[in-house]
Amino acid sequence: MLLTNILCLMMPILLAVAFLTLTERKILGHMQLRKGPNTVGPHGLLQPVADAVKLFTKEPLHPLTSSKLMFIIAPTLAFTLALSLWAPLPMPHPLINLNLSILFILAMSSLAVHSILWSGWASNSKYALIGALRAVAQTISYEVTLAIILLSIMLINGSFTLSTLTITQEQMWLILPTWPLAMMWFISTLAETNRTPFDLSEGESELVSGFNVEYAAGPFALFFMAEYTNIILMNALTATLFFGAFHNPLFPELHTINLTTKTLILVFLFLWIRASYPRFRYDQLMHLLWKNFLPLTLALCTWHMTMPISLAGIPPQT
């Protein structure tokens, strides 16, 4: 039964990842006044299938001087962790109902850093290693603000469980009282998923393709799928934390459709930002976090901690 549940969760995620790649290419094409993929199938709809067949039937090459075992483990770990992060997400019922689901997501996303570092080190290429070090420094740095923002939201929620956020936001979505946190959260998720304007790890003019430069065929596809799975997850998490998850005053019974619609709008925003913004310089990226976001999030966390106590917004003592 559990295996069936896992498959029912994973298959739609993999389909969503496949068609997100097509959506991204179509949207970028239209924004750059061109058509995008339009040859494979009607209106290019079978392009993801063709890409998957091409990648998984190619020979997986690896450099002679690379560490072969770690070279294969790194993309497998990245993809496994990206999928396991979906387990505690309520849609409307989570696969695993954890009391500390927020901590589980934070811990598992921290583990993903190892796959990036291993891939860069195991490739035995200076470009891959520099790209991996950049990506690791960026990911670890922005996880600090993500954790503090999550703590602030959990102080309002009163629990570390994602499922209770829906009840918390029945009267008002948390985007309204905590909009500065929401803005910093959204920018941090862009940095966490290595997306434009924070895709420093794959600066083509400097590092070719970043930490996955030596990868080809199946292992490269696993990294690619892990990245897009994380993008959808981060946007689903944003919808759950700030936009009332599947709460919609007009159609309260359409649980999953409400969550999916909000997630799709946020994913479209990710793609719009990719089409619009240039890449940051690395020192600007770090200054934004350590000199701007960190002091602001700490101040707002203290504010959200003291406000309920000062206004006596505490549960009644029985």
Swiss-Prot record:
Its EC number(s) = 7.1.1.2
Q: Which residues cross the membrane?
A: 2-22, 69-89, 102-122, 147-167, 172-192, 231-251, 253-273, 294-314
Enzymatic reactions: a ubiquinone + NADH + 5 H(+)(in) = a ubiquinol + NAD(+) + 4 H(+)(out)
Record GO biological process: aerobic respiration
Major location (coarse): mitochondrion
Tell me which InterPro entries the record gives.
Answer: NADH_UbQ_OxRdtase_su1/FPO, NADH_UbQ_OxRdtase_su1_CS
Pfam families recorded for this chain?
NADHdh
Localization, UniProt = Mitochondrion inner membrane
Q: Which GO terms describe its molecular function?
A: NADH dehydrogenase (ubiquinone) activity
* Entry-linked PROSITE patterns: COMPLEX1_ND1_1 (PS00667), COMPLEX1_ND1_2 (PS00668)
How this chain sits in the membrane, per its record, is: Multi-pass membrane protein
What are its GO cellular component terms?
mitochondrial inner membrane
Keywords annotated in UniProt:
Electron transport, Membrane, Mitochondrion, Mitochondrion inner membrane, NAD, Respiratory chain, Translocase, Transmembrane, Transmembrane helix, Transport, Ubiquinone
Kindly give the PANTHER family that the UniProt entry links to this protein: NADH DEHYDROGENASE SUBUNIT 1 (PTHR11432), NADH-UBIQUINONE OXIDOREDUCTASE CHAIN 1 (PTHR11432:SF3)
Question: Hey, which family's this protein in?
Answer: Belongs to the complex I subunit 1 family.
Sum up the protein's function in the record's words: Core subunit of the mitochondrial membrane respiratory chain NADH dehydrogenase (Complex I) that is believed to belong to the minimal assembly required for catalysis. Complex I functions in the transfer of electrons from NADH to the respiratory chain. The immediate electron acceptor for the enzyme is believed to be ubiquinone.
Put simply, this protein is called: NADH-ubiquinone oxidoreductase chain 1
Instruction: Supply the gene name.
Output: MT-ND1
